[in-house]
Amino acid sequence: MLNEQKCEACSIDAIALSKEEQQSLLLQLSDWQIIERDEIPQLEKVYKFKNFKQAWAFSNKIAELAEDEFHHPSILLEWGKVTITWWSHSIKGLHKNDFICASKCDALAIEE
């Protein structure tokens, strides 16, 4: 399972996942989508909560995950929702690390 894996160091010469690899890994996630911003594929999901405080607490858990994995997403915190966007900045695309971290986000959301 993806959430049991650990991120690997992703250097600038790492190879981004092919569209086929992305789609295969996406099948292992729930409600994530691949979007493009500035021609860079990114993995994104919106989590919904009952209030701002719960959303904030979840955001803090994601921040801790990011530090633990040394891989950092975009986190948009709003009233009752958090949008998480993963991509690998160094390769301007998606790496397996992004899917691993997305899966770990889902595991953290279940704990909420």
UniProtKB/Swiss-Prot annotation:
Pfam families given in the database record: Pterin_4a
GO molecular function: 4-alpha-hydroxytetrahydrobiopterin dehydratase activity
Lyase is among the record's keywords: yes
Keywords attached to this entry: Lyase
UniProt keyword Lyase present: yes
The protein's Enzyme Commission number: 4.2.1.96
Xref: InterPro entries: PCD_sf (IPR036428), Pterin-4-alpha-carb_dehyd (IPR050376), Pterin_deHydtase (IPR001533)
Catalytic activity: (4aS,6R)-4a-hydroxy-L-erythro-5,6,7,8-tetrahydrobiopterin = (6R)-L-erythro-6,7-dihydrobiopterin + H2O
Any one of the GO BP annotations: tetrahydrobiopterin biosynthetic process
NCBIfam families given in the database record: PRK00823.1-1
Family: Belongs to the pterin-4-alpha-carbinolamine dehydratase family.
UniProt cross-references to HAMAP family, sorted A to Z: Pterin_4_alpha (MF_00434)
Full protein name: Putative pterin-4-alpha-carbinolamine dehydratase
